[in-house]
């Protein structure tokens, strides 16, 4: 399996609504590695590694609104180098 990396910045009502935890659960279920963290501007950063199908599924999940309780106004994504991370974690 060829691994790819993507960095996604998510904007909207994405802090204080369980977004990081739900993203963590979703990523674990879909066997992605990487991390999710809150940013000081109120957005959330997701760095995810997986095959192209896994990453496309993540993007589709965000397009569909992501976790319940969140309101995604928009998000941007770009490719990134793959790091050797064995799991998906929530960074604080």
UniProtKB/Swiss-Prot annotation:
Top enzyme class: hydrolase
Domain Acylphosphatase-like span(s) in chain numbering: 5-92
PROSITE patterns: ACYLPHOSPHATASE_1, ACYLPHOSPHATASE_3
Keyword rRNA processing attributed: no
Active site: 20, 38
Superkingdom to which the source organism belongs: Bacteria
Record's keyword terms, sorted: Hydrolase
InterPro entries membership: Acylphosphatase, Acylphosphatase-like_dom, Acylphosphatase-like_dom_sf, Acylphosphatase_bac, Acylphosphatase_CS
Presence of the UniProt keyword Hydrolase in the record: yes
Catalytic reaction list: an acyl phosphate + H2O = a carboxylate + phosphate + H(+)
E.C. code: 3.6.1.7
Any matching Pfam family: Acylphosphatase
GO molecular function: acylphosphatase activity
NCBIfam families documented for this protein: PRK14426.1
Family: Belongs to the acylphosphatase family.
Name of protein: Acylphosphatase
Originating organism: Photorhabdus laumondii subsp. laumondii (strain DSM 15139 / CIP 105565 / TT01) (Photorhabdus luminescens subsp. laumondii)
Lineage per the UniProt record: Bacteria, Pseudomonadati, Pseudomonadota, Gammaproteobacteria, Enterobacterales
